[in-house]
């Protein structure tokens, strides 16, 4: 079964053709450079550019896969969560294509896509622990199956990737923040600044994360530089922030490993491409799996892949399904299964 995947939940306009859930025939992505001067995503600009590009990326996905449009068996599209304007463009285009081609439609949760991404290039036996690290989400979960996912912990404020973007904006390191901070950190001293690490000891929060304190402390350091007319050392700031940001993750992960006795971990989302993080995770001495670098960030291959499995088990979505910026049928809270 050949699945056309469409992903437009934020600023990346993506389309892919995936066969039988794991054979990627094509994977096309257009990133919107227009947001760089704003040091962040401007929703109105994002949705307008999706309108301009979505037909093109779908055409390129079909051409690159060397198939005819009539060979598409299923259309999978991200319908939640994300920027509502961007989601609407993708969902409405997918609906129109579904009607025109008389092909079934399956609407997919963006987080389920990220959770599935490592399975596109790895065969991993369930159960395993999953960590999603992106600009919008920081979630630690236990996966018993592709559709049986128990949330153990989540960020209580900023997402990990969001914190990287905000620090990069304040220090004018460029956008997106993650890759730029990682690059600057290479030539920095990670112990130059002792930024705080937030760990929760209460039972109900033992797997949770927080980045607001770290973000605030890092921004306050910038004010200290200015007040003292001191030279701003972006390399040291980047290295110290990056170290603290990832140490924030380690203790909740260690707790989950101990409590569940699961020795396998998959990590996905844009932040998963960070090489410093991967070195830190190696110290856990457990089986760890990542998607290829191009599948860490938003992409349509992961949507097509999980869409195939969801369709086989649950059938097609209603053509009346609408885009949702947030989740209506469940919340990202501890103990809730997706």
UniProtKB/Swiss-Prot annotation:
Alphabetical keyword list: Acyltransferase, Cytoplasm, Iron, Metal-binding, Transferase, tRNA processing
Residue sites binding Fe cation per the record: 110, 114, 298
One Pfam family recorded for the sequence: TsaD
Signal peptide, first to last residue: none
Annotated Gene Ontology cellular component terms: cytoplasm
GO molecular function: iron ion binding; N(6)-L-threonylcarbamoyladenine synthase activity
Cofactor(s) of this protein: Fe(2+)
SUPFAM superfamilies: Actin-like ATPase domain
Cofactor note: Binds 1 Fe(2+) ion per subunit.
UniProt GO BP: tRNA threonylcarbamoyladenosine modification
Enzyme class per UniProt: transferase
Residues noted as binding substrate in the record, renumbered to the chain: 132-136, 165, 178, 274
InterPro entries: ATPase_NBD, Gcp-like_dom, KAE1/TsaD, Peptidase_M22_CS, TsaD
Catalytic activity as recorded in UniProt: L-threonylcarbamoyladenylate + adenosine(37) in tRNA = N(6)-L-threonylcarbamoyladenosine(37) in tRNA + AMP + H(+)
Compartments where located: Cytoplasm
Enzyme Commission number(s) of this protein: 2.3.1.234
Database matches in HAMAP family: TsaD (MF_01445)
Family: Belongs to the KAE1 / TsaD family.
Primary role: Required for the formation of a threonylcarbamoyl group on adenosine at position 37 (t(6)A37) in tRNAs that read codons beginning with adenine. Is involved in the transfer of the threonylcarbamoyl moiety of threonylcarbamoyl-AMP (TC-AMP) to the N6 group of A37, together with TsaE and TsaB. TsaD likely plays a direct catalytic role in this reaction.
PANTHER family: TRNA N6-ADENOSINE THREONYLCARBAMOYLTRANSFERASE, TRNA N6-ADENOSINE THREONYLCARBAMOYLTRANSFERASE, MITOCHONDRIAL
Protein name in UniProt: tRNA N6-adenosine threonylcarbamoyltransferase
Gene that encodes it: tsaD
């Amino acid at each position: 079964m050949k699945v056309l995947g469409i992903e437009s939940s934020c600023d990346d306009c993506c389309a892919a053709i995936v066969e039988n859930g794991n054979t990627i025939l094509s994977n096309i992505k257009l990133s919107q450079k227009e947001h760089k001067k704003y040091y962040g995503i401007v929703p109105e600009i994002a949705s307008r550019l999706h309108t301009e590009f979505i037909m093109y990326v779908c055409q390129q996905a079909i051409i690159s896969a060397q198939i005819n449009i009539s060979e598409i068996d299923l259309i999978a599209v991200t319908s939640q969560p994300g920027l509502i304007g961007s989601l609407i463009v993708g969902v409405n285009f997918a609906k129109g294509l579904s009607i025109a081609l008389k092909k079934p439609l399956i609407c997919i949760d963006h987080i389920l896509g990220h959770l599935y991404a490592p399975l596109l290039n790895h065969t991993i036996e369930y159960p395993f622990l999953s960590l999603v690290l992106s600009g919008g989400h920081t979630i630690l979960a236990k996966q018993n199956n592709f559709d049986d996912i128990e949330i153990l912990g989540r960020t209580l404020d900023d997402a990990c990737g969001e914190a990287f973007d905000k620090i990069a904006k304040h220090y004018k390191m460029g956008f997106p923040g993650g890759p730029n901070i990682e690059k600057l950190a290479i030539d920095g001293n990670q112990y130059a600044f002792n930024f705080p690490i937030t760990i929760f000891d209460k039972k109900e929060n033992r797997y949770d994360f927080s980045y607001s304190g770290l973000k605030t402390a890092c921004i306050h350091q910038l004010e200290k530089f200015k007040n003292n007319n001191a030279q701003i050392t972006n390399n040291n700031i980047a290295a110290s922030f990056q170290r603290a940001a990832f140490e924030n993750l380690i203790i909740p992960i260690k707790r989950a490993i101990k409590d569940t006795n699961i020795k396998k971990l998959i990590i996905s989302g844009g932040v998963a491409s960070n090489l410093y993080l991967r070195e830190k995770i190696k110290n856990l001495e457990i089986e760890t799996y990542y998607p290829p670098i191009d599948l860490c960030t938003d992409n349509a291959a992961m949507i097509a892949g999980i869409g195939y499995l969801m369709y086989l088990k649950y059938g097609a979505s209603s053509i009346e399904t609408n885009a949702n910026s947030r989740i209506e049928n469940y919340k990202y809270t501890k103990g809730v299964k997706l």
